[in-house]
């Protein structure tokens, strides 16, 4: 409060007086309401010359929370067979054998409970912050390896198939993360943005952690064969908070975050006569040896009552803490200065575009949220939409129809499979115009994460190879993955494994694939056209020497086939049978280069290539595997690989894959290709679910300038537009557009009469199979928001005179059927008049976004209950409302292909 001025009062006194008005004053968060203005007394011309005012700044709570804390110290040992030293598996076939990792951390509780930060958070209710992570590396020059630090929001609270630990190596490296190379990095840093769907973290009642942070090994740790101190790598993990909002004081304290601090009470027992004699002897000795001290004690005791012999004291005794039920105060942590960023390509998912831009040229053309304009009229409307950046091309394309129903024409469900148009769904809401606002401040990134170019530009590891001193010159690298050093150039997935289960009479073989993000997108379409990009990185030491040749072979890929698979024919690709003198190639010298990024523009005698890929590939198929790819890259040594005995006799080759300038054509039925998401069973013996049908990243590029484009090509965007005009007639630029199209989730949903049935009985199954765009795309995002639309097509033959009706109700998502709940938002139709029941479920929710397929957070958004007075069969189709979207891009799941059963 301001000091009242009274120049006549020069003394430090104030006499009582009466004021005429009430006084209301606020000091910090406390408001005083006094009947009279209080008298105030202050020291006149106060001064303070204490050196404490100048020896240091006054540290705030926010500054304290921003101090880095040493969270963990890790030692990685080369050659160890422990699980925390194993590299990522290419596939995960059951949940008993998930992906191995070096270390994991649960955030933010790990940071909040370290370094005394919990005490600073005491007596506050809400916290919202980012978490910064810095790993400091200490490795000698004789050891090589590459790690991947990645995080996954709510990883332990989603369906198992959506966990980072139950997906492929390509899926893991598609999560937001950063590489750590033992020889190139002495430290890395990343920012994990606030990842909860709630507005703030509840410090009092909430122990809900929302991020799992993992440290994976991409390649084996390479060192000399003998285990010694030179085969170890030391890692120090620091974490701190940033972008902090700490609000709403409270008297409550969460004891799991803030430790108890108690007072130790010690009682001195009654002194006996023997004790008195001991004291008397001590006083005699003191009088003789230290007269001044003796006189002081006697003077102090002379005024006391001699009969008092019981003494009780309260002290803070560290010596006796072990015998008392009290928690000692944590010692003050050392004030570690906040480290500066050493690698600019770091950061949260909101910085993903920046990181990928260094790798995937053209990512800067991805639209930001809110980049919309009015439609432009032109001869070809979809071209005008693209040029004018209208909202439709980003997926805001299908408003509901509010016009009066035409009395003379009844075409229910018209155009339901189109991405753009007018929808006739009846909203189960209060307002017929129910619709959420724009996406600003919903997800951490301002970039449109559903743009096709953004998703396909997300790199993932497809190969981890090994080059040994014994490998032949001019022979393709064959160690490592099934395709070895042969890399098909194209968007489709070309790698798979066969999962086999047996019983007494039969053997079942199922294809399991490991798609990268661009391959995952390609699965939803029949044809593709793009510039394919491959980053080939060598994990080595300075003592490894040799040269690799990487050449592009256009057209057909030499392959061999088995009854279950397709693989390259390496015997046809040596230097004699396949000389590369006239091919586009790059020679990588291990002495000078660590990596190379190769861009291969689209080149073919066709405007588009097929998207089939490895799906169903075997010796019995009747299609050409090469129709899915424009050619192949081949990695083979052109010199011997050499090294001294003090280092490993091999190096690792890591191949990342992504796509630029992407065009995908003809949405295909999601049951006609490898779009069933693989749900890893619990054990290797368990059978898997089959369908009876035909069917963040922030890549730390260490050498941004080391990029080569094979052969000159015209402007890719111009060539793509020409191909679309000649062979497609439309363009899909955003995955959100697919969410506006209705796709079937059940061909024959049987509804018993006079029974309420929750739509989740159907959608929970569809979401696991990934059989419509909404469920399939949900696996590469962690959050969603917005309403859903459903169309029920009655297929039961009904008599004209039969009074049959179907009715839908708005309910909470995890609501139990209740026959009395009939008075909320609902819709009713009579199949004899209108065989299509069209409804929309709005997004009624406490939060601006929700986790996808959460197994613990239930009942937050609305759902649908369906009822019919007559038993009916329905074809059910689903789509997103015009405000529905996914956000927070993560890695891809594994997909499942053809299943074949044979008799033993």
Swiss-Prot record:
It comes from the Viruses. Belongs to the picornaviruses polyprotein family. It comes from Acute bee paralysis virus (strain Rothamsted) (ABPV). Keywords: Capsid protein, Host cytoplasm, Virion. InterPro entries: Dicistrovirus_capsid-polyPr_C, Picornavirus_capsid, Rhv-like, Viral_coat, VP4_dicistrovir. This is Structural polyprotein. Specific enzymatic cleavages in vivo yield mature proteins. Residues 1-27, 35-54, 320-348 are annotated as: Disordered. Residues 329-343 have a biased composition (Basic and acidic residues). Structural polyprotein: precursor of all the viral capsid proteins. Residues 39-53 have a biased composition (Polar residues). One of its GO terms (cellular component) is host cell cytoplasm. GO terms for molecular function: structural molecule activity.
């Amino acid at each position: 409060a301001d000091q009242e001025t009274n120049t006549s009062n020069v003394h430090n006194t104030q006499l009582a007086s009466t004021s005429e008005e009430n006084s209301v004053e606020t000091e910090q968060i406390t408001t005083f309401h006094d009947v009279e203005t209080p008298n105030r007394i202050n020291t006149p011309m106060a001064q303070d010359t204490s050196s404490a005012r100048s020896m240091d700044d006054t540290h705030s709570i926010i500054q304290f929370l921003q101090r880095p804390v040493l969270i963990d110290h890790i030692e990685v040992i080369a050659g160890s067979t422990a699980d925390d030293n194993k590299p990522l598996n290419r596939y995960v076939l059951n949940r008993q054998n998930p992906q191995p990792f070096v270390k994991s951390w649960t955030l933010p509780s790990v940071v909040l409970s370290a370094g005394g930060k919990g005490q600073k958070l005491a007596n506050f209710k809400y916290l919202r912050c980012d978490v910064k992570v810095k790993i400091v590396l200490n490795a000698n020059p004789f050891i090589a390896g590459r790690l991947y630090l990645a995080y996954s929001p709510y990883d332990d609270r989603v369906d198992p198939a959506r966990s980072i630990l139950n997906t492929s190596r390509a899926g893991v490296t598609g999560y937001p993360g950063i590489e750590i190379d033992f020889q190139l990095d002495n430290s890395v840093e990343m920012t994990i943005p606030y990842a909860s769907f709630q507005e703030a973290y509840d410090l009092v009642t909430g122990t809900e952690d929302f991020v799992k942070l993992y440290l994976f090994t991409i390649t084996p740790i390479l060192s000399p064969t003998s285990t010694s101190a030179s085969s170890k790598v030391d890692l120090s993990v620091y974490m701190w908070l940033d972008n902090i909002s700490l609000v709403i004081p409270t008297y409550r304290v969460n004891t799991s975050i803030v430790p108890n601090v108690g007072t130790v009470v010690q009682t001195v027992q009654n002194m006996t006569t023997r004790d008195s004699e001991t004291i008397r002897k001590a006083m005699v000795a003191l009088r003789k040896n230290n007269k001044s001290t003796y006189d002081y004690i006697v003077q102090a005791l002379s005024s006391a009552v001699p009969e008092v012999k019981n003494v009780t004291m309260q002290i803070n005794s560290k010596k006796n803490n072990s015998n008392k039920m009290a928690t000692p105060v944590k010692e003050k942590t050392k004030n570690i200065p906040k480290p500066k960023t050493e690698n600019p390509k770091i950061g949260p998912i909101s910085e993903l575009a920046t990181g990928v831009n260094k790798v995937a040229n053209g990512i800067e053309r991805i639209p930001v949220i809110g980049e919309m304009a009015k439609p432009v009229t032109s001869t070809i409307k979809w071209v005008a939409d693209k040029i004018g950046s209208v909202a439709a091309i980003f997926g805001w394309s299908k408003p509901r129809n509010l016009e009066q129903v035409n009395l003379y024409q009844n075409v229910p469900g018209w155009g339901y499979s189109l991405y753009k148009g007018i929808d006739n769904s009846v909203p189960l809401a209060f307002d017929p115009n129910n619709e959420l606002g724009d996406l600003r401040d919903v997800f951490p990134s301002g970039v449109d994460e559903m743009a096709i170019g953004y998703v396909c530009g997300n790199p993932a590891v497809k190969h981890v190879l090994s080059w040994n001193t014994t490998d032949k010159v001019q022979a393709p690298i064959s160690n490592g993955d099934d395709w070895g050093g042969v890399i098909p150039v194209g968007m489709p997935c070309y790698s798979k494994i066969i999962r086999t289960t047996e019983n007494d009479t039969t053997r079942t073989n199922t294809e399991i694939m490991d798609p990268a993000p661009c391959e995952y997108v390609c699965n939803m379409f029949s044809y593709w056209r793009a510039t394919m990009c491959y980053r080939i990185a060598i994990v080595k030491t300075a003592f490894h020497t040799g040269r690799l040749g990487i050449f592009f072979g256009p057209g057909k890929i030499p392959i061999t086939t088995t009854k279950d698979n397709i693989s390259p024919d390496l015997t046809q690709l040596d230097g004699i049978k396949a000389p590369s003198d006239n091919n586009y190639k790059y020679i990588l010298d291990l002495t000078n280069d660590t990596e190379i990024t190769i861009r291969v523009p689209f080149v073919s005698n066709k405007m588009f290539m097929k998207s089939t890929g490895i799906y169903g590939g075997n010796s019995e198929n009747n299609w050409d595997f090469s129709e899915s790819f424009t050619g192949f890259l081949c990695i083979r040594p052109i010199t011997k690989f050499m090294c001294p005995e003090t280092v490993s006799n091999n190096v690792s080759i890591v191949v990342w894959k992504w796509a630029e300038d992407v065009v995908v054509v003809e949405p295909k039925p999601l049951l006609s290709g490898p779009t069933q998401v693989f749900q890893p069973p619990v054990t290797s013996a368990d059978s898997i679910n089959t369908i009876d049908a035909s069917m963040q990243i922030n890549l730390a590029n260490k050498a941004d300038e080391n990029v080569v484009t094979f052969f000159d090509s015209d402007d890719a965007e111009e060539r793509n537009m020409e191909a679309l005009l000649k062979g497609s007639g439309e363009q899909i630029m955003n995955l959100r557009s697919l969410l506006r199209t209705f796709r079937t989730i059940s061909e024959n949903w049987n509804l018993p009469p006079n029974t309420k049935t929750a739509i989740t009985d159907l959608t929970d199954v569809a979401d696991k199979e990934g059989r419509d765009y909404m469920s399939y795309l949900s696996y590469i995002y962690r959050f969603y928001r917005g309403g859903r639309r459903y169309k029920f097509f009655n297929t039961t033959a009904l008599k004209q005179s039969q009074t049959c009706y179907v009715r839908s109700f708005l309910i909470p998502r995890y609501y139990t059927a209740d026959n009395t709940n009939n008075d909320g938002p609902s819709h009713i139709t009579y199949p004899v008049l209108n065989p299509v029941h069209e409804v929309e479920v709005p997004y009624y929710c406490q939060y601006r976004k929700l986790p996808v397929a959460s197994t613990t957070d239930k009942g937050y958004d609305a759902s649908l209950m369906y009822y019919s007075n007559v038993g009916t069969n329905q074809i059910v189709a689903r789509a997103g409302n015009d405000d529905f979207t996914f956000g927070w891009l993560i890695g891809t799941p594994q997909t499942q292909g053809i299943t074949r059963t044979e008799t033993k």
